[in-house]
């Protein structure tokens, strides 16, 4: 049964991160109209039908959600009762350059968690993320001033981070917040074994996200075809890394009708990497 979803509310970004794996999927990214309100209504109906106590929802995907902040607010308002009751646990992930006090206050008031992408050491972050380090750090401190603690942080782990693992771990220790380390994939990617070895080390010192059947990119097992889905480009996909695979249905499909014929595979591995071998 589906209990979590991510919605990509746009396909555009104000940065040009060198490692962004969507650069390699341009033919699969398109601006087909997608009724996010209908999607949210389907999620609401699914929650009611199955009496779900918790549904996890991310406003995250192919682009920078803060570029369409007015639209994001309208989606949040549409499910505000479910957010405030805790039935939907919602979050968004931003590159951190478009944050301001009012936006932080709005999302916090509506119980939408904010994750900020920060690749650790300044020279590593700037190499990959369009020299945005200073702006991102300023806004992380702004978040702390507004909310009283640091936000969840997302760090993409490539060879640069592996080569300076101890320094990177020490860098994140100052924040005391939950860290999601993401395995760099695509042409600059690292192996799953390298990534998991880094996670094992980081988890000795940091509050590191390591899920169950979620995603190998974040240190869990692959949940493709199980309980989570990804909305983008007018479609529902088996996962955000698989928008270029033939596993999709229309974005307005009721959740009970979303069935992907994912074959049996070893879920310590990434389905995308298994399917494209």
For each predicted feature, which ranges?
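A short, flexible beta-alpha/helix-coil linker loop
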Residues: 24-28, 121-123, 186-187
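Radical SAM/AdoMet-radical enzyme domain recognition
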Residues: 37-62, 68-184
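Flexible glycine/acidic-rich beta-alpha junction loops that bind and position SAM and/or redox cofactors
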Residues: 178-197, 210-221, 246
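Short cysteine/histidine-rich metal-coordination sites, predominantly Zn2+-binding motifs
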Residues: 33-39, 237-240
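Glycine-centered loop/turn positions within well-structured domains
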Residues: 11, 15, 123, 237
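Canonical Radical SAM [4Fe-4S] cluster-binding loop centered on the CxxxCxxC motif
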Residues: 1-37
């Amino acid at each position: 049964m589906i209990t979590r979803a991510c919605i990509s509310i746009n396909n555009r970004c104000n940065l040009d991160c060198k490692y962004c794996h969507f650069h390699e999927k341009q033919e699969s990214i398109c601006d087909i109209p997608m009724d996010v309100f209908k999607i949210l209504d389907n999620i609401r109906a699914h929650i009611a039908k199955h009496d779900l106590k918790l549904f996890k929802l991310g406003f995250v995907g192919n682009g920078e959600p803060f570029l369409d902040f007015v639209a994001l607010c309208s989606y949040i308002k549409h499910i505000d009762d479910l957010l405030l009751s805790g039935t939907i646990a919602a979050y968004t992930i931003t590159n951190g350059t478009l944050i301001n006090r009012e936006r932080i206050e709005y999302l916090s008031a509506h119980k939408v968690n904010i994750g900020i992408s920060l690749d650790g050491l300044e020279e590593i972050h700037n190499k990959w993320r369009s020299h945005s380090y200073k702006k991102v750090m300023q806004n992380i401190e702004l978040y702390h001033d507004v909310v009283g603690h640091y936000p969840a942080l997302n760090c993409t782990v490539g060879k640069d981070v592996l080569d300076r693992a101890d320094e990177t771990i020490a860098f994140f220790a100052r924040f005391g917040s939950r860290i999601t380390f993401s395995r760099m994939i695509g042409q600059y990617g690292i192996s799953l074994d390298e990534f998991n070895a880094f996670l094992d080390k980081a988890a000795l010192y940091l509050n590191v996200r390591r899920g169950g059947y979620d995603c190998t990119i974040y240190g869990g097992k692959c949940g493709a075809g199980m309980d989570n889905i990804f909305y983008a480009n007018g479609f529902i996909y088996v996962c955000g890394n698989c928008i270029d695979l033939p596993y999709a249905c229309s974005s307005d499909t009721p959740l009970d009708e979303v069935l992907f014929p994912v074959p049996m595979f070893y879920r310590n591995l990434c389905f995308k990497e298994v399917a494209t071998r």
